[in-house]
Amino acid sequence: MKNIKITQIKSAIGRLPKHKKTLIGLGLRYIGHTVIREDTPSIQGMVKKISYILKIQEE
């Protein structure tokens, strides 16, 4: 499977609790934090839900 590089570009302060939990589920903790995840349907759904907070790059 392909991997995607996910970077948090906005703060989690003031976001919906579901969106904060989604960030934690992806393993993101702070602005500028980058993680590499497999490009699975579940990860794609999480990314789509909070795309306004993230920057996505394919590897």
Curated annotation (Swiss-Prot):
Alphabetical list of InterPro entries matching this protein: Ribo_uL30_ferredoxin-like_sf (IPR036919), Ribosomal_uL30_bac-type (IPR005996), Ribosomal_uL30_ferredoxin-like (IPR016082)
One GO BP annotation of this record: translation
GO MF term (any one): structural constituent of ribosome
UniProt keyword Heme present: no
Pfam families for this protein: Ribosomal_L30
GO CC aspect terms: cytosolic large ribosomal subunit
Keywords from the UniProt entry: Ribonucleoprotein, Ribosomal protein
CDD domains membership: Ribosomal_L30
Record's subunit section: Part of the 50S ribosomal subunit.
Xref: NCBIfam families: rpmD_bact
Protein name as annotated: Large ribosomal subunit protein uL30
Lineage, broadest ranks: Bacteria, Pseudomonadati, Pseudomonadota, Gammaproteobacteria, Enterobacterales
Gene: rpmD
